[in-house]
Amino acid sequence: MAKKSMIIKQKRTPKFKVRAYTRCERCGRPHSVYRKFKLCRICFRELAYKGQLPGIKKASW
């Protein structure tokens, strides 16, 4: 779980556009965030296994 101060800091508009970065909307993790879902890899995996992400299924071949 991310620190609340960092989540609040990230929500402010940065002085320069290149300083903007993505965070997981569920836990606030700044790394490994899928832009399409706005989730980090860990939250994405949990929700996919529970079947809460429509159109996502485990690959098998």
Curated annotation (Swiss-Prot):
Binds 1 zinc ion per subunit. The keyword Ribosomal protein applies. Gene3D superfamilies: 30s Ribosomal Protein S14, Chain N (4.10.830.10). One of its GO terms (molecular function) is zinc ion binding. GO terms for biological process: translation. Keywords: Metal-binding, Ribonucleoprotein, Ribosomal protein, RNA-binding, rRNA-binding, Zinc. Pfam families: Ribosomal_S14 (PF00253). The keyword RNA-binding applies. Binds 16S rRNA, required for the assembly of 30S particles and may also be responsible for determining the conformation of the 16S rRNA at the A site. HAMAP family: Ribosomal_uS14_2_B. Part of the 30S ribosomal subunit. Contacts proteins S3 and S10. This is Small ribosomal subunit protein uS14. The gene is rpsZ.
